[in-house]
Design a protein with these regions (language model features):
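P-loop/Walker A phosphate-binding loop and immediately adjacent motor/lid segment at beta-alpha junctions
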Residues: 8, 17, 61-71, 142-143
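Rossmann-like adenosine-cofactor binding region
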Residues: 23-107
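C-terminal helix-to-coil terminal segments
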Residues: 97, 102-145
Length: 145
């Protein structure tokens, strides 16, 4: 999802920087700037976490590097952060957006004034439902021979 988000934001004129385990040729070809995590966190106004489930990237030090007056989006299935460090960061002038409690990490944070959580998976589109249904039917047909 990170690549699609970057492409959409670029369309609207955003300067795109990213962090990954390694620099991506396709991203470089689009003019996206690969940065070390600490530099990306310090320089970006908006940060989108698009990580695999149970991948925690943001701890106390990373939130310190982010500083204040930031917007954090999480499109993952689980939190991209250590909960205690995240809760402390939320007390600053920051905002967090996510789609589900699973992505937020704690039901206790739902009513936090700096959290916006829809509690509905943004990946649950009609097209995704149709694709999943077709996949299940194909698997059943293959299993039954």
């Amino acid at each position: 999802s990170g690549g699609m988000i970057a492409d959409a934001l670029k369309f609207f004129g955003a300067d795109i920087s990213y962090y990954a385990r390694s620099e991506k040729e396709a991203a470089t070809a689009k003019g996206y700037c690969f940065l070390p995590l600490e530099k990306l966190l310090a320089e970006s106004e908006v940060i989108c976490c698009c990580l695999n489930k149970n991948t925690v990237l943001l701890h106390e030090e990373e939130f310190r590097q982010m500083g204040n007056r930031k917007i954090l989006f999480n499109t993952g299935l689980s939190p991209a952060w250590d909960e205690a460090a995240f809760a402390e960061w939320l007390e600053g002038d920051n905002l967090c957006f996510c789609d589900t409690i699973g992505a937020l990490g704690s039901e206790q944070l739902l009513n936090h004034p700096h959290v916006r959580c829809m509690q509905v998976s943004t990946g649950r589109t009609r097209q995704a439902f149709d694709r999943l249904s077709a996949k299940v039917l194909a698997n059943l047909s293959e299993y039954n021979g």
